[in-house]
Amino acid sequence: MTEQLADKKCVPCRGGVPPLKGEELEVLHKSVPQWSVVNQHHITRAFTFPDFKQALDFVNRVGALAEEQGHHPDILLAWGKAEITLWTHKIDGLTESDFIMAAKIDRLVG
């Protein structure tokens, strides 16, 4: 299912839709198991790299992907580490687009 999600395009949220909860959330989470669901509000994953440059290169690729998809994560960059957090700000919770973006980011690291 990760490949299927990674092939989809993020859809801009119109607002007024409820955030994902319960079974819907669990099913999507299974497609990106390396991501952690936090308080049914956001998903996060830490990536490690051998040095700062590789972490920075990864963050730049995530940034380009975010612009392409119109769905922008919070990104923490440190030496040898990048932490990505996703949620849909317009509804202050999770939508399918967050999981699509997570699957696309996973594809960047192989």
Name the predicted role of every residue range.
Residues M1-P33, V38-L56, N60-G110:
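Long, contiguous binding/interaction regions
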